[in-house]
């Protein structure tokens, strides 16, 4: 693994787009703009999200709602980033067939969000990931366990999970799809927005998508200005006005 230094962090953080000339007030973002290339919002929305991190999206959502949007415990199973509209599923860990039902019913570009309960067992792995990727599913977020890590780490298909283990149940198909999910104090609905990367997973309610995207834009503009000042040698505490 490459050594991370302050210089490389700055270089990594500088993966920002020049948004200074964009009048964000002219845009009315909808989650449907993500897959609608004819929408006037599509290009800018993709630019913002492609260059954003879960940290920035969470900060933005916090400024809008007072909540982080983070689903605790979820972590990436590979280096792939994902964002998109959620298609939900709920199943006992004895049944990985429900994951296939969700995959079969989800639309291209959607992200599967699968909630599992029961004893530790996997409901997602290499075969499901390969099939989902071929169908055009954007990725899988699994509130449960994945498996086949030797394959998942090399697949160009995003998978997020609580952890991984080798055992699995059976293809029963007895769970539910396209239903509301409750995780701790969070209600995740079909059609909500999810964003996941190496930092974790953030869920944004559909009704707050526009406000959160505008706030994400503003976070990115602010951070790009801060990075420019840091490269001039200024202290971060000075830039943000921290009392000393």
Model-found features: residue ranges?
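A glycine-rich, hydrophobic loop/mini-helix early in the fold
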Residues: 74-129
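Extended, positively charged loop/linker patches that create polyanion-binding surfaces
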Residues: 118-181
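Intrinsically disordered, low-complexity regions enriched in acidic/Ser/Thr/Pro/Gln residues
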Residues: 2-91, 224, 228-236, 241
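Structural motif
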Residues: 68, 85-88, 110-113, 137-141, ...
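Acidic, glycine-rich flexible loop/linker segments
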Residues: 162-239
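Small beta-barrel nucleic-acid-binding modules, primarily SNase/OB-fold domains
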Residues: 19-25, 29, 113, 124, ...
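Generic structural signal for well-ordered, non-membrane alpha-helical segments
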Residues: 50-58, 121, 125, 205, ...
């Amino acid at each position: 693994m490459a050594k991370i230094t302050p210089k490389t962090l700055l270089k990594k953080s500088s993966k920002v787009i020049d948004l200074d000339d964009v009048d964000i007030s002219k845009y009315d973002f909808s989650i449907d703009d993500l897959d609608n290339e004819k929408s006037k919002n599509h290009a800018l929305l993709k630019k913002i999200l492609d260059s954003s991190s879960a940290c920035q999206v969470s900060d933005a959502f916090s400024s809008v709602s007072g909540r982080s949007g983070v689903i605790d415990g979820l972590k990436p199973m590979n280096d792939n980033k994902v964002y998109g509209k959620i298609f939900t599923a709920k199943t006992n860990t004895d049944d990985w067939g429900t994951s296939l039902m969700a995959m079969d019913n989800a639309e291209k570009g959607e992200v599967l969000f699968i909630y599992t309960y029961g004893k530790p067992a996997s409901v997602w792995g290499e075969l499901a990931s390969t099939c989902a990727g071929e169908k055009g599913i954007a990725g899988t977020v699994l509130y449960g366990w994945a498996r086949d890590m030797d394959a998942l780490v090399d697949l160009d298909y995003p998978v997020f999970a609580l952890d991984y283990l080798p055992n699995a149940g059976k293809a029963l198909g007895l769970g539910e799809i396209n239903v509301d999910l409750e995780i701790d104090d969070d209600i995740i609905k079909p059609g909500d927005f999810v964003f996941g990367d190496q930092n974790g997973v953030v869920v944004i309610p559909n009704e707050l998508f526009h406000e959160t995207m505008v706030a994400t834009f503003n976070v990115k503009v602010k951070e790009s200005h801060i990075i420019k000042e840091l490269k001039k040698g200024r202290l971060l505490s000075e830039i943000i006005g921290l009392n000393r």
